[in-house]
């Protein structure tokens, strides 16, 4: 992963491949952001005018490269847009800083070192720039650049491999010896490392990432970071009566798993349970998805990846809260052994579910995990899942839905998500939609009314949450996997959606700010 340093050098004297400065969109043209003073001085105070001549406006996402002035050690200056000049002087939005830093880091792929002279006068600004740059520098290259066995044996394979991400981010303008700055940057580094691990998991092809191999990754990470890991294999799931997880996974040749991760702090007063949907490949099962809808279904375990990353991050940060993660892992495949539409499953809770559509499988594995998590009486449960296409239709590709059995908890999660830069929107759980899941055969069906499908799924999950436990459901079907061109710090492919929200929730819980 990209290295991060708090540089003691100034922008003018830093030896790097490039210097990054921020430019805001002013009424009369581009306006240089704080942090760019030394670079502007090297241009005799005319950097903004030069950028305007080159067509730069300071709009968000805009990037302009130009040769550095003679007074700078770095050969290139990268000016990145921050959007409109803030109403309050120097009060740049943290998300604007993240996105700008990410845009610059992506543009500097292949470089060894870049100095980031973006606004970093406050601890919060420095952390935002660090996060954005590290997230933007991410690249998934595990399956690229291998040996070409068709090439002549004496040929040298130059330039065949992928360009490596920016190797080092040197943060300028921060205070390297200040404990608060150092702590904030160390937090950013730990957080981004785990977000990128979640991205790697989402991007890994399903022939290599399946329930057993995912469980192995979790086990190894647990040993490294002091997280207890328990893996229930197929035999243990049968013995325990986990009918939902087993029912979804029974059509696959590779069996399902339920993984429990437990981080505990000796002085913790609260326990937070996180539950993640981990369908490592979703074909739809017997209710097979149509052509054109299968290619990205390796991402259907993004909820489990987010939960895994959040628990490990909490452990790495030493948060004073107990955090338990439950990864409900299965492949949803058609076969002679697969669950059929019309089958009835007996869930871990004891309830029976009539399966009307085997492509509504995520709620089945989550239901078992929610019941199991509820048995431990946590103070709150949050589940995360790429659950419904209906949520994507409602909110688009960049916003996740937040549902809950407690309005205050739903509001808190929405506000936390917005605070950390993850767009979200509170969604209702209308009681009148519950009747659509009535079954003449079982206690409940796994499908209901077509309209409001995302809300129906939330109502289904609510049935499996223990009494008196605050619960929220994050449907990340839209933002979990980005199929378009990269933007800001968001890459193509797995995004690590919801990790930042879950970690901030754990921090708030540890601080006693929630409940």
Swiss-Prot record:
Pfam families the record matches: Peptidase_M17, Peptidase_M17_N
Positions annotated as active site in the UniProt record: 289, 363
Keyword Ribonucleoprotein in annotation: no
Chain residues that bind Mn(2+) 1: 282, 359, 361
Cofactor: Mn(2+)
Domain of life, source organism: Bacteria
Cofactor notes: Binds 2 manganese ions per subunit.
Catalytic reactions of this protein: Release of an N-terminal amino acid, Xaa-|-Yaa-, in which Xaa is preferably Leu, but may be other amino acids including Pro although not Arg or Lys, and Yaa may be Pro. Amino acid amides and methyl esters are also readily hydrolyzed, but rates on arylamides are exceedingly low; Release of an N-terminal amino acid, preferentially leucine, but not glutamic or aspartic acids
GO cellular component terms, A-Z: cytoplasm
Keyword terms: Aminopeptidase, Cytoplasm, Hydrolase, Manganese, Metal-binding, Protease
Protein location: Cytoplasm
Enzyme Commission number(s): 3.4.11.1, 3.4.11.10
InterPro entries: Leucine_aapep/pepB, Macro_dom-like, Peptidase_M17_C, Peptidase_M17_leu_NH2_pept, Peptidase_M17_N
Binding site for Mn(2+) 2: 277, 282, 300, 361
Primary localization class, coarse: cytoplasm
One GO BP annotation of this record: proteolysis
Similarity comment: Belongs to the peptidase M17 family.
Designated name of the protein: Probable cytosol aminopeptidase
Native source species: Streptomyces griseus subsp. griseus (strain JCM 4626 / CBS 651.72 / NBRC 13350 / KCC S-0626 / ISP 5235)
Gene: pepA
